[in-house]
């Protein structure tokens, strides 16, 4: 009989802890926005296997605006493996958005060129500072060339803070 009471007590405690954990869980928030960027650095190396094939390292700066009105400074860099003549290529890189208080969100991206001047891919938060410490989230983006050294990306995804 005592064994049955212990099992019942453990079950009640486990159930209470489970309900508490569910209650304290933070649901991921759906977010979306646009990044407007200006290229400040571009270095490329010709591969030579076909005309226009290069490996490039770049740096962009700009503004990130969310659909909820939040804006941040944006910094982004990456490595591209692409053909400048055909537009075919892929890439990956890193970025940082910094809000007005100086808190930062760090993220990675990877994608591919889906047409001349248009890229599609995925992004994911890696870490954050200040109110973004412990950030989690990921999403998708489509990036468009707007003019020489100018581009913008429309993005959406999820953000979760502890």
Roles of regions detected by a PLM:
Residues 24-162:
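Beta-strand-enriched cores of mature, soluble protein domains
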């Amino acid at each position: 009989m005592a064994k049955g009471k212990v099992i019942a007590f453990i079950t009640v405690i486990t159930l209470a802890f489970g309900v508490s954990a569910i209650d304290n869980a933070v649901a991921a928030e759906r977010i979306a926005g646009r990044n407007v960027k200006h290229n400040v650095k571009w270095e490329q190396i010709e591969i030579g296997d076909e005309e226009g094939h290069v490996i490039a390292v770049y740096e962009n700066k700009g503004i990130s605006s969310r659909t909820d009105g939040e804006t941040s400074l944006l910094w982004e860099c990456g490595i591209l493996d692409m053909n400048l003549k055909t537009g075919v290529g892929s890439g990956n890189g890193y970025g940082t958005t910094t809000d007005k208080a100086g808190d930062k969100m760090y993220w990675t991206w990877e994608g591919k060129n889906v047409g001349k001047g248009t890229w599609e891919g995925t992004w994911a938060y890696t870490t954050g500072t200040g109110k973004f410490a412990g950030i989690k989230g990921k999403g998708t983006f489509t990036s468009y060339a707007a003019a020489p050294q100018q581009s913008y990306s429309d993005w959406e995804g999820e953000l979760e803070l502890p």
